[in-house]
Amino acid sequence: MAKLSLKNIAKRYPGAERRVLEEISAEIADGEFVVIVGPSGCGKSTLLRMVAGLESTEDGEIRIGERLVNQLEPKDRDIAMVFQNYALYPHMTVAENMGYALKLKGLKKVEIMERVLKVAAVLELEQLLQRKPRELSGGQRQRVAMGRAIVREPAVFLFDEPLSNLDAKLRGQMRLEIQRLHRRLATTSLYVTHDQVEAMTLADRVIVLNKGHIEQIGAPDEIYDRPATAFVAAFMGSPGMNLFDAQADESGERLLLGDGVSLALPAANPALAGRRLKAGIRPEHLRAAGEGGETLSLRVDSLEMLGADNYVYGLLAGQNVVARLAHGHRPEPGSRLEVAVRAESLHLFDAETQRRIEHAAASQASLAVS
């Protein structure tokens, strides 16, 4: 095992106007599980492929342990990769697929089989070792792909959207499987996904990527509770945070949301007076009236009933919002719903920079740079 260091990584494809990746720096500790998450086209898979040696690096340094690996071939980097499409050899059995990389390294058959059997037991693949990939389900194929990576005993695991081809139930099962494996193996892991649920449930830390730039690095609860930018606030969460174009009033005590709607700021702050802001409210913080906080009126457009929770979609202060309510609340489309908002649940972002404004530093209107 080893730490993974990325320093000022940059990438531009020939003929492209802008870089795909710009000044990416991150330190991944020995044994840490880090998830890179972002929308399609943000550069996350390109970054993973650069770590693997499948893409060249324009600028910057990639180190695995203390070794600079920029110029090393993939086979010499001591990494193992799990792909979205499994990448299994169709003519080989499960056992042969899992042991093939060890065979190429020249290991003896006895040692290869020992490793394969050991990993097969961990992944509950013992009964499938003589089957071909076509005889396996999607979840079984992905477990074989993971097993093939594990038998190599690499310094770093790389996962490229490994659950994307699975249905929702299997994705949930495989998330638990990956969690369990990481607790057991404690191998340094870099995992790429567009799915924020995977990021929040699997990661020790999350790297949120957008348009080739890092928006925020932090633990899942930090990313969710204190998003560094309006982009992170909207992207992380299901549904994402409601964002309003807003402005502080001239006293710095209230937030003007539009259509005559206003809310008290968490703390009076004259330095914010008249300032244009983005205001954020998580769907679960639009509570049913009577649960504390200022009461606002939401016009209901539609309702999604999801069992324990109901999602109410509608208009508030002239802007589209979603509120997450308990199962018993079922407002009719076209009706008015009274919701309550506590001041401390507000998130504030600068309208121009989109950076977070911390409540604790609001007296100086400081921008968070974490």
Swiss-Prot record:
Compartment list: Cell inner membrane
Root EC class: translocase
Keyword presence, Nucleotide-binding: yes
GO molecular function per UniProt: ABC-type glycerol-3-phosphate transporter activity; ATP binding; ATP hydrolysis activity
Keyword Aminoacyl-tRNA synthetase among record annotations: no
Membrane topology: Peripheral membrane protein
Subunit structure of this chain's protein: The complex is composed of two ATP-binding proteins (UgpC), two transmembrane proteins (UgpA and UgpE) and a solute-binding protein (UgpB).
Name assigned to this protein: sn-glycerol-3-phosphate import ATP-binding protein UgpC
Organism whose genome encodes this protein: Chromobacterium violaceum (strain ATCC 12472 / DSM 30191 / JCM 1249 / CCUG 213 / NBRC 12614 / NCIMB 9131 / NCTC 9757 / MK)
Gene that encodes the chain: ugpC
